[in-house]
Protein backbone atom coordinates (compact mmCIF):
# COMPACT_ATOMS: atom_id res chain seq x y z
CA UNK A 1 0.00 0.00 0.00
CA UNK A 2 2.85 2.30 0.90
CA UNK A 3 4.43 1.73 -2.51
CA UNK A 4 1.10 2.53 -4.19
CA UNK A 5 0.76 5.76 -2.24
CA UNK A 6 4.32 6.75 -3.04
CA UNK A 7 3.78 6.00 -6.71
CA UNK A 8 0.52 7.95 -6.66
CA UNK A 9 2.21 10.90 -5.02
CA UNK A 10 5.02 10.68 -7.54
CA UNK A 11 2.54 10.54 -10.41
CA UNK A 12 0.64 13.50 -8.98
CA UNK A 13 3.84 15.47 -8.57
CA UNK A 14 4.88 14.57 -12.11
CA UNK A 15 1.52 15.71 -13.49
CA UNK A 16 1.74 18.92 -11.50
CA UNK A 17 5.21 19.43 -12.87
CA UNK A 18 3.93 19.01 -16.40
CA UNK A 19 1.19 21.55 -15.70
CA UNK A 20 3.72 23.99 -14.33
CA UNK A 21 5.99 23.41 -17.30
CA UNK A 22 3.08 24.04 -19.66
CA UNK A 23 2.27 27.26 -17.85
CA UNK A 24 5.89 28.35 -17.97
CA UNK A 25 6.00 27.50 -21.67
CA UNK A 26 3.34 30.12 -22.49
CA UNK A 27 4.85 32.69 -24.85
CA UNK A 28 4.02 36.26 -23.79
CA UNK A 29 2.48 38.37 -26.57
CA UNK A 30 1.31 41.98 -26.33
CA UNK A 31 -1.37 42.94 -28.85
CA UNK A 32 -2.01 46.63 -29.48
CA UNK A 33 -5.56 47.58 -30.49
CA UNK A 34 -6.53 50.49 -32.73
CA UNK A 35 -9.20 51.80 -30.41
CA UNK A 36 -10.70 51.58 -26.96
CA UNK A 37 -12.19 48.19 -26.13
CA UNK A 38 -15.66 47.31 -27.36
CA UNK A 39 -17.55 45.28 -29.93
CA UNK A 40 -14.90 45.77 -32.65
CA UNK A 41 -12.43 43.86 -30.46
CA UNK A 42 -14.78 41.07 -29.41
CA UNK A 43 -13.00 38.34 -31.36
CA UNK A 44 -9.73 38.93 -29.56
CA UNK A 45 -11.47 39.05 -26.18
CA UNK A 46 -13.21 35.77 -27.04
CA UNK A 47 -9.87 34.19 -27.94
CA UNK A 48 -8.64 35.14 -24.46
CA UNK A 49 -11.81 34.16 -22.61
CA UNK A 50 -12.40 30.88 -24.42
CA UNK A 51 -8.77 29.87 -23.93
CA UNK A 52 -7.81 29.76 -27.61
CA UNK A 53 -4.60 31.71 -27.09
CA UNK A 54 -3.70 29.66 -24.04
CA UNK A 55 -4.30 26.41 -25.91
CA UNK A 56 -1.90 27.68 -28.57
CA UNK A 57 0.76 28.29 -25.94
CA UNK A 58 0.32 32.07 -25.90
CA UNK A 59 -0.11 34.42 -22.96
CA UNK A 60 -1.73 37.38 -24.73
CA UNK A 61 -2.13 40.84 -23.23
CA UNK A 62 -4.55 43.08 -25.14
CA UNK A 63 -3.82 46.82 -24.94
CA UNK A 64 -6.33 49.52 -25.86
CA UNK A 65 -5.52 52.09 -28.54
CA UNK A 66 -6.25 55.67 -29.54
CA UNK A 67 -6.77 55.59 -33.30
CA UNK A 68 -5.44 53.55 -36.21
CA UNK A 69 -2.96 56.23 -37.21
CA UNK A 70 -1.42 56.22 -33.76
CA UNK A 71 -1.31 52.43 -33.58
CA UNK A 72 0.36 52.18 -36.98
CA UNK A 73 2.99 54.67 -35.82
CA UNK A 74 3.65 52.59 -32.70
CA UNK A 75 4.60 49.58 -34.80
CA UNK A 76 6.46 51.65 -37.39
CA UNK A 77 8.61 53.16 -34.64
CA UNK A 78 9.26 49.83 -32.94
CA UNK A 79 7.32 50.65 -29.78
CA UNK A 80 4.85 47.84 -30.55
CA UNK A 81 5.36 44.62 -32.49
CA UNK A 82 1.90 43.17 -33.14
CA UNK A 83 -1.23 45.25 -33.58
CA UNK A 84 -4.64 45.92 -35.14
CA UNK A 85 -5.40 49.00 -37.24
CA UNK A 86 -6.91 50.32 -40.43
CA UNK A 87 -5.20 48.96 -43.53
CA UNK A 88 -4.91 52.39 -45.14
CA UNK A 89 -3.02 53.87 -42.18
CA UNK A 90 -0.71 50.84 -42.17
CA UNK A 91 -0.13 50.82 -45.93
CA UNK A 92 0.75 54.51 -46.03
CA UNK A 93 3.58 53.96 -43.58
CA UNK A 94 4.75 50.80 -45.36
CA UNK A 95 4.92 52.75 -48.64
CA UNK A 96 7.23 55.21 -46.87
CA UNK A 97 9.54 52.45 -45.71
CA UNK A 98 8.08 51.40 -42.37
CA UNK A 99 9.27 47.82 -41.69
CA UNK A 100 5.94 46.08 -41.11
CA UNK A 101 3.29 44.06 -42.95
CA UNK A 102 -0.38 43.15 -42.75
CA UNK A 103 -0.79 39.46 -41.93
CA UNK A 104 -4.58 39.11 -41.77
CA UNK A 105 -7.19 41.34 -43.45
CA UNK A 106 -10.16 41.27 -41.08
CA UNK A 107 -12.54 43.97 -42.39
CA UNK A 108 -12.97 43.48 -46.13
CA UNK A 109 -14.47 46.96 -46.47
CA UNK A 110 -14.11 50.02 -44.29
CA UNK A 111 -16.65 51.18 -41.67
CA UNK A 112 -15.93 54.89 -42.14
CA UNK A 113 -18.80 57.28 -42.68
CA UNK A 114 -19.81 60.92 -42.55
CA UNK A 115 -22.41 61.49 -39.86
CA UNK A 116 -24.66 64.56 -39.68
CA UNK A 117 -27.74 65.43 -37.68
CA UNK A 118 -30.81 65.42 -39.92
CA UNK A 119 -31.86 68.80 -38.55
CA UNK A 120 -28.82 70.39 -40.22
CA UNK A 121 -30.41 69.71 -43.60
CA UNK A 122 -27.42 67.74 -44.87
CA UNK A 123 -29.00 65.23 -47.25
CA UNK A 124 -26.00 64.44 -49.43
CA UNK A 125 -22.25 64.86 -49.36
CA UNK A 126 -22.66 67.87 -51.65
CA UNK A 127 -24.44 69.59 -48.77
CA UNK A 128 -21.17 69.66 -46.82
CA UNK A 129 -20.16 72.75 -48.79
CA UNK A 130 -19.77 75.66 -46.40
CA UNK A 131 -20.14 73.40 -43.34
CA UNK A 132 -17.88 72.67 -40.38
CA UNK A 133 -16.73 69.05 -40.31
CA UNK A 134 -15.08 67.41 -37.30
CA UNK A 135 -12.08 65.17 -38.01
CA UNK A 136 -10.88 62.75 -35.28
CA UNK A 137 -7.20 63.25 -34.54
CA UNK A 138 -4.98 60.22 -35.13
CA UNK A 139 -7.65 58.14 -36.85
CA UNK A 140 -7.96 56.71 -40.35
CA UNK A 141 -10.82 58.88 -41.57
CA UNK A 142 -8.71 62.00 -42.00
CA UNK A 143 -6.18 60.54 -44.45
CA UNK A 144 -9.01 58.97 -46.46
CA UNK A 145 -11.06 62.17 -46.70
CA UNK A 146 -9.40 63.40 -49.94
CA UNK A 147 -10.44 60.15 -51.62
CA UNK A 148 -14.06 60.55 -50.51
CA UNK A 149 -14.14 64.17 -51.62
CA UNK A 150 -12.64 63.42 -55.04
CA UNK A 151 -15.10 60.58 -55.63
CA UNK A 152 -17.94 63.00 -54.96
CA UNK A 153 -16.72 66.11 -56.76
CA UNK A 154 -15.68 68.03 -53.65
CA UNK A 155 -12.52 69.70 -52.32
CA UNK A 156 -11.25 70.30 -48.80
CA UNK A 157 -11.60 74.03 -49.40
CA UNK A 158 -15.36 73.53 -49.84
CA UNK A 159 -15.71 73.08 -46.07
CA UNK A 160 -14.04 73.92 -42.78
CA UNK A 161 -12.21 70.91 -41.36
CA UNK A 162 -11.67 70.90 -37.60
CA UNK A 163 -9.27 68.41 -36.04
CA UNK A 164 -10.42 67.43 -32.58
CA UNK A 165 -9.82 64.82 -29.87
CA UNK A 166 -11.66 61.55 -30.27
CA UNK A 167 -13.67 62.13 -27.08
CA UNK A 168 -14.97 65.45 -28.41
CA UNK A 169 -16.48 64.12 -31.63
CA UNK A 170 -19.93 63.06 -30.44
CA UNK A 171 -20.62 65.95 -28.04
CA UNK A 172 -19.37 68.48 -30.60
CA UNK A 173 -21.90 67.25 -33.13
CA UNK A 174 -24.75 67.07 -30.63
CA UNK A 175 -24.00 70.57 -29.34
CA UNK A 176 -23.83 72.06 -32.82
CA UNK A 177 -20.16 73.01 -32.69
CA UNK A 178 -19.73 71.15 -35.99
CA UNK A 179 -22.26 70.30 -38.67
CA UNK A 180 -20.93 66.83 -39.44
CA UNK A 181 -18.17 64.48 -38.36
CA UNK A 182 -15.98 61.91 -40.03
CA UNK A 183 -17.20 58.90 -38.14
CA UNK A 184 -17.57 55.18 -38.28
CA UNK A 185 -20.55 52.88 -38.26
CA UNK A 186 -18.98 50.89 -35.42
CA UNK A 187 -18.24 53.88 -33.19
CA UNK A 188 -19.61 57.42 -33.34
CA UNK A 189 -22.69 56.51 -35.35
CA UNK A 190 -23.84 54.00 -32.74
CA UNK A 191 -23.03 56.34 -29.85
CA UNK A 192 -25.10 59.07 -31.46
CA UNK A 193 -28.03 56.79 -32.21
CA UNK A 194 -28.02 55.48 -28.65
CA UNK A 195 -28.42 59.07 -27.48
CA UNK A 196 -31.48 59.49 -29.68
CA UNK A 197 -29.86 61.48 -32.48
CA UNK A 198 -31.55 61.37 -35.88
CA UNK A 199 -28.76 61.05 -38.40
CA UNK A 200 -27.95 61.26 -42.05
CA UNK A 201 -25.13 58.77 -42.64
CA UNK A 202 -22.89 58.54 -45.69
CA UNK A 203 -20.70 55.40 -45.61
CA UNK A 204 -17.40 55.77 -47.45
CA UNK A 205 -17.84 52.31 -48.98
CA UNK A 206 -21.16 53.35 -50.56
CA UNK A 207 -19.78 56.64 -51.86
CA UNK A 208 -16.83 55.58 -53.98
CA UNK A 209 -14.35 54.39 -51.34
CA UNK A 210 -14.75 50.59 -50.88
CA UNK A 211 -11.28 50.01 -49.44
CA UNK A 212 -10.10 47.15 -47.25
CA UNK A 213 -9.90 48.12 -43.62
CA UNK A 214 -8.99 46.91 -40.15
CA UNK A 215 -6.26 44.27 -40.16
CA UNK A 216 -3.76 42.44 -37.98
CA UNK A 217 -0.21 43.56 -38.73
CA UNK A 218 3.26 43.10 -37.31
CA UNK A 219 6.74 44.51 -37.52
CA UNK A 220 9.08 42.75 -39.92
CA UNK A 221 11.37 41.89 -37.01
CA UNK A 222 8.54 40.17 -35.16
CA UNK A 223 7.52 38.26 -38.29
CA UNK A 224 11.07 37.13 -38.97
CA UNK A 225 11.88 36.17 -35.38
CA UNK A 226 8.52 34.64 -34.39
CA UNK A 227 6.85 33.06 -37.45
CA UNK A 228 5.31 30.17 -35.50
CA UNK A 229 4.07 32.45 -32.73
CA UNK A 230 2.50 34.66 -35.39
CA UNK A 231 0.76 31.71 -37.04
CA UNK A 232 -0.61 30.55 -33.68
CA UNK A 233 -1.77 34.05 -32.79
CA UNK A 234 -3.61 34.55 -36.08
CA UNK A 235 -5.26 31.12 -35.97
CA UNK A 236 -6.44 31.64 -32.38
CA UNK A 237 -7.62 35.18 -33.16
CA UNK A 238 -9.66 34.08 -36.17
CA UNK A 239 -11.12 31.27 -34.08
CA UNK A 240 -12.07 33.93 -31.56
CA UNK A 241 -13.79 35.96 -34.24
CA UNK A 242 -15.68 32.91 -35.45
CA UNK A 243 -16.86 32.36 -31.87
CA UNK A 244 -17.86 36.02 -31.54
CA UNK A 245 -19.95 35.95 -34.70
CA UNK A 246 -21.78 32.83 -33.52
CA UNK A 247 -22.05 33.86 -29.86
CA UNK A 248 -22.16 37.67 -29.74
CA UNK A 249 -23.57 37.96 -26.21
CA UNK A 250 -20.92 35.66 -24.75
CA UNK A 251 -18.19 37.43 -26.71
CA UNK A 252 -19.23 40.77 -25.22
CA UNK A 253 -19.08 39.17 -21.77
CA UNK A 254 -15.45 38.35 -22.53
CA UNK A 255 -14.84 41.98 -23.54
CA UNK A 256 -16.40 43.12 -20.27
CA UNK A 257 -14.21 40.71 -18.30
CA UNK A 258 -11.04 42.03 -19.94
CA UNK A 259 -12.12 45.67 -19.78
CA UNK A 260 -14.66 46.25 -16.96
CA UNK A 261 -15.44 49.82 -18.04
CA UNK A 262 -16.97 48.66 -21.33
CA UNK A 263 -20.62 49.59 -21.94
CA UNK A 264 -22.26 46.24 -22.75
CA UNK A 265 -25.19 47.73 -24.68
CA UNK A 266 -22.89 49.84 -26.81
CA UNK A 267 -20.42 47.02 -27.41
CA UNK A 268 -23.24 44.69 -28.46
CA UNK A 269 -24.45 47.22 -31.02
CA UNK A 270 -20.90 47.73 -32.29
CA UNK A 271 -20.38 44.02 -32.87
CA UNK A 272 -23.67 43.78 -34.77
CA UNK A 273 -22.67 46.76 -36.92
CA UNK A 274 -19.31 45.35 -38.01
CA UNK A 275 -20.49 41.79 -38.68
CA UNK A 276 -21.21 42.40 -42.41
CA UNK A 277 -17.67 43.75 -42.95
CA UNK A 278 -15.94 40.39 -42.45
CA UNK A 279 -17.28 38.91 -45.67
CA UNK A 280 -18.19 41.95 -47.76
CA UNK A 281 -17.27 42.28 -51.41
CA UNK A 282 -17.30 38.56 -52.10
CA UNK A 283 -14.58 37.57 -49.63
CA UNK A 284 -14.09 33.81 -49.37
CA UNK A 285 -12.68 33.41 -45.85
CA UNK A 286 -12.76 35.50 -42.69
CA UNK A 287 -9.37 37.10 -42.20
CA UNK A 288 -7.93 36.25 -45.62
CA UNK A 289 -6.86 39.04 -47.95
CA UNK A 290 -8.50 39.08 -51.37
CA UNK A 291 -6.10 40.18 -54.09
CA UNK A 292 -8.87 41.97 -55.99
CA UNK A 293 -9.85 44.01 -52.93
CA UNK A 294 -6.28 45.10 -52.40
CA UNK A 295 -5.74 45.93 -56.07
CA UNK A 296 -8.82 48.17 -55.97
CA UNK A 297 -7.66 49.77 -52.73
CA UNK A 298 -4.22 50.49 -54.19
CA UNK A 299 -5.78 52.04 -57.31
CA UNK A 300 -8.15 54.26 -55.33
CA UNK A 301 -5.57 55.48 -52.85
CA UNK A 302 -2.97 56.20 -55.51
CA UNK A 303 -5.45 58.50 -57.26
CA UNK A 304 -5.17 60.97 -54.36
CA UNK A 305 -1.49 60.27 -53.64
CA UNK A 306 -2.21 58.39 -50.40
CA UNK A 307 -0.21 55.52 -51.87
CA UNK A 308 2.39 55.64 -54.66
CA UNK A 309 1.25 54.75 -58.15
CA UNK A 310 2.39 51.43 -59.55
CA UNK A 311 3.06 49.89 -56.15
CA UNK A 312 2.51 46.14 -55.94
CA UNK A 313 -0.39 45.73 -53.48
CA UNK A 314 1.23 42.55 -52.17
CA UNK A 315 4.01 44.67 -50.71
CA UNK A 316 1.50 45.65 -48.01
CA UNK A 317 0.06 42.27 -47.06
CA UNK A 318 0.61 38.53 -47.01
CA UNK A 319 -1.54 35.44 -46.42
CA UNK A 320 1.52 33.33 -45.65
CA UNK A 321 0.85 33.04 -41.92
CA UNK A 322 -2.83 32.16 -42.13
CA UNK A 323 -4.20 28.67 -41.44
CA UNK A 324 -4.96 26.46 -44.43
CA UNK A 325 -8.27 27.27 -46.14
CA UNK A 326 -9.80 24.10 -44.74
CA UNK A 327 -9.10 25.34 -41.21
CA UNK A 328 -10.57 28.81 -41.75
CA UNK A 329 -14.16 29.97 -41.51
CA UNK A 330 -15.63 30.29 -44.98
CA UNK A 331 -17.86 33.20 -45.89
CA UNK A 332 -21.36 32.11 -46.80
What are these model-predicted stretches?
Residues 61, 69, 163, 268-274, ...:
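Short linear loop/turn motifs
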Residues 295-332:
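Conserved C-terminal helix/tail region of periplasmic/extracytoplasmic solute-binding proteins
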Residues 225-306:
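Secondary-structure end/capping motifs
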Residues 1-12:
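Bacterial N-terminal signal peptides that target proteins for export
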Amino acid sequence: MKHWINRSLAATAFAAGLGLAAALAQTPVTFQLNWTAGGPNAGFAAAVGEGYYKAAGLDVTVVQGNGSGNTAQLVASGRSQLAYADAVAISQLISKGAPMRIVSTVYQSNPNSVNALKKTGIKSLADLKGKKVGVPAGSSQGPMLPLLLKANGLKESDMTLINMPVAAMVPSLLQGQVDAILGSLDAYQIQLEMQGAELSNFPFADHGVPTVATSIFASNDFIKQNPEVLKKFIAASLKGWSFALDNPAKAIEHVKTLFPDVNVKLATAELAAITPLFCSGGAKFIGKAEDAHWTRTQALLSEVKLLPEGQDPKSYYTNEYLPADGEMRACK
